[in-house]
UniProtKB/Swiss-Prot annotation:
Gene: truA
Stated name of the protein: tRNA pseudouridine synthase A
Catalytic activity: uridine(38/39/40) in tRNA = pseudouridine(38/39/40) in tRNA
Record has tRNA processing as a keyword: yes
Record flagged with keyword tRNA processing: yes
Keywords: Isomerase, tRNA processing
One Gene Ontology term from the biological process aspect of the record: tRNA pseudouridine synthesis
Quaternary structure, from the entry: Homodimer.
Superkingdom as given in the UniProt entry: Bacteria
Classification via CDD domains: PseudoU_synth_EcTruA
Pfam families assigned: PseudoU_synth_1 (PF01416)
Location of the active site: D52 (nucleophile)
Family per record: Belongs to the tRNA pseudouridine synthase TruA family.
UniProt-listed Enzyme Commission number(s): 5.4.99.12
C-alpha cells in the first residue's frame, strides 16, 4: 500500500464541515468520491482536524492509502478535476511513511480568526469573516488573551457536545493584530477542544466591546463552566491554517 499526504484548502460556507455525514455534503465525502473516480479505489480519508460547517481551511492535511503508485502531481490534478464544482482543492501531495497519520502524528495546529471591524459590512468578505460594526478595543483584547496562554482546563470554552476525554489543553499562541479595518486572531496548540477557538473569540470580543474587563477572562477560565464564557463566534471567520508534524 502507498500512503499519500495531501494538503487541502476549501471554503466551508456551503459545506457541512470536514466529516462525512448522511444527507449533506462534506469535505471528506467530496475528496473520497473524487479519489474513487480516478483510482477506482474506495478510500477513507483521515484529516488532521474536523472543521465545522462554515469553517474554512488554507492548509488542512489528510492522508489516504492506495494499492497502486500514482505520481503525486497527477493525484493533485485528478482530485481538483473531480472535486468540481465544490470550493475544495488540493495544492500539495506527497508520499508519506506508512506510520504517518494526519491526525495522530500532528504536533501543533494553527488557526486564524478574521474580524472585519468597521461601521458597514464587507461584500468581499461575506461569509469569510465576522463583521462587527462597533469599534473594538484591541489593546484590551490583547491584555485579556494573556490569561489564556499556557496549559489550562478549558471547560468554559468547550462545546457542550465536545467528546474530548480531557478539557486540559495548552494554548501556545494567541496573538491579536489589527490591520486597518481587519482584526486577526492567531491561535495555535497541539490540539483544540470542539468550538474552543470560536468560544475564545466570542469572549474576547466582549472584552473588545468593553462589556467585560480584561481580567474577567481569568475568572471565566477558572469557572470551568461554559455558561460563564461569551457566545460562540460565527464559523465564517475561522480558518484552519496549517498542521505541524
Amino acid at each position: 500500500m502507498y500512503r499519500y499526504k495531501i494538503t487541502i484548502e476549501y471554503l466551508g460556507t456551503d459545506l457541512a464541515g470536514w466529516q462525512r455525514q448522511a444527507g449533506v455534503m462534506s469535505v471528506q465525502q467530496i475528496l473520497e468520491e473524487a479519489i474513487y473516480k480516478f483510482s477506482g479505489e474506495q478510500v477513507i480519508l483521515f484529516g488532521s482536524g474536523r472543521t465545522d460547517a462554515g469553517v474554512h481551511a488554507i492548509g488542512q492535511v489528510a492522508h489516504f492509502d492506495l494499492s497502486k503508485y500514482l505520481e503525486p502531481h497527477k493525484i493533485i490534478t485528478a482530485i481538483n478535476y473531480f472535486a468540481r464544482p465544490y470550493a475544495v482543492g488540493v495544492w500539495n501531495c506527497e508520499l508519506a511513511p506508512n506510520n504517518f497519520h494526519a491526525r495522530f502524528s500532528a504536533t501543533s495546529r494553527y488557526y486564524i480568526y478574521r474580524i472585519i471591524n468597521r461601521p458597514y459590512p464587507s461584500v468581499i468578505d461575506l461569509n469569510r469573516a465576522w463583521w462587527i460594526s462597533a469599534p473594538l478595543d484591541v489593546p484590551a483584547m490583547q491584555q485579556a488573551a494573556v490569561y489564556l496562554l499556557g496549559k489550562h482546563d478549558f471547560t468554559s470554552f468547550r462545546a457542550s457536545s465536545c467528546q474530548s476525554k480531557s478539557p486540559i489543553k495548552t494554548l501556545t499562541e494567541l496573538n491579536i493584530i489589527k490591520e486597518d479595518e481587519e482584526i486577526k486572531l492567531y491561535l495555535s496548540a497541539p490540539s483544540f477542544l470542539h468550538h474552543m477557538v470560536r468560544n475564545i473569540v466570542g469572549s474576547l470580543v466582549l472584552v473588545g466591546k468593553n462589556i467585560w474587563q480584561a481580567e474577567q477572562i481569568k475568572d471565566v477560565l477558572e469557572a470551568k463552566d461554559r455558561k460563564a464564557a461569551g457566545p460562540t463566534a460565527p464559523a465564517s471567520g475561522l480558518y484552519f491554517v496549517k498542521t505541524a508534524y
